[in-house]
Amino acid sequence: MTSTLIPKETSTPGGRDLRDARADYFFKLLLTAAVAFVLIALVSAALSMLWGGRQALQLQGVSFFYSTEWNPVENKYGALTPIYGTIVTALIAMLIAVPVSFGIAFFLTEVAPRWLRRPVGTAIELLAGIPSIIYGMWGLFVLVPVMTDYITPFLNDHIGTLPLIGTLFQGPPLGIGTLSAGFVLAIMVIPFISSIMREVFLTVPTQLKESAYALGSTKWEVSWNIVLPYTRSAVIGGMFLGLGRALGETMAVAFVIGNSVRLSPSLLTPGTTIAALIANDFGEATESYRSALLLLGFVLFIVTFAVLVIARLMLLRLSRKEGN
């Protein structure tokens, strides 16, 4: 009696390679689609704002970007005042937030006891999750009265009389203004910058810091001569990330800046930013006014994009220097 053996089906190496190649192809296709989706969304957002602002651009021409006159009744639009307010408030925020963030990060990594590092770090990170409107309400009901009663009179009396910089600190004690908006923005971006600084400070090799301490260096000398040079690229990247956040903030700034489209060198007078002006006026804008606001949105897009490009170029330059 003879028996026939039925060969067992097995997957050949060639078939397995074919399935792997197909899976890899579809995976690459999925990743490409994700990247294409982001790029298309980015370009379409910019082009839609530019297309929506074509009427204002045709009406005003290039003067839209450098004129200070903003009169919707007469269809006269100049973007220089909100552009100035956007840049100045962001710079004030960075001047305050960067040194404070550095101090927080160095305290949590080098000075604070271990039992205190985690709760303090968590509390600071939670600040990043607070809605911006909460910051705006805090600024309006807490910061503005303090500015009105204490800070603005002090600045007027002691700094407003100085040559050159005195003009920046002269104004009525209203409390609302560019300086108040800068303070609120600083509080908002501190969690982002300090979290990045803390994480990169933890990457500094312990041997480097211990060697500096063994040679008699103080904590300040270690932070300035060891920690910062080692983490310079990442720190600069975190600073520009915070700057980009400050440039586009809307609601918190709208609460405390005063929303006045008048160019003034004083930081104590009401002003406006691009985002705040769009948020306040877009809902009730006429067709021509809406076109001007859309063109302002395109300007804000370009400013933010330029900041990120500059940050990227600086990081590339630093990495090349470090590589050499």
Swiss-Prot record:
GO annotations of cellular component type: plasma membrane
All copies of domain ABC transmembrane type-1, residue ranges: 83-311
InterPro entries: MetI-like, MetI-like_sf, Phosphate_PstC, Phosphate_Transport_Permease
CDD domains per record: TM_PBP2
Keyword Transmembrane: yes
GO MF term set: phosphate transmembrane transporter activity
Protein name from the UniProt record: Phosphate transport system permease protein PstC
Gene: pstC
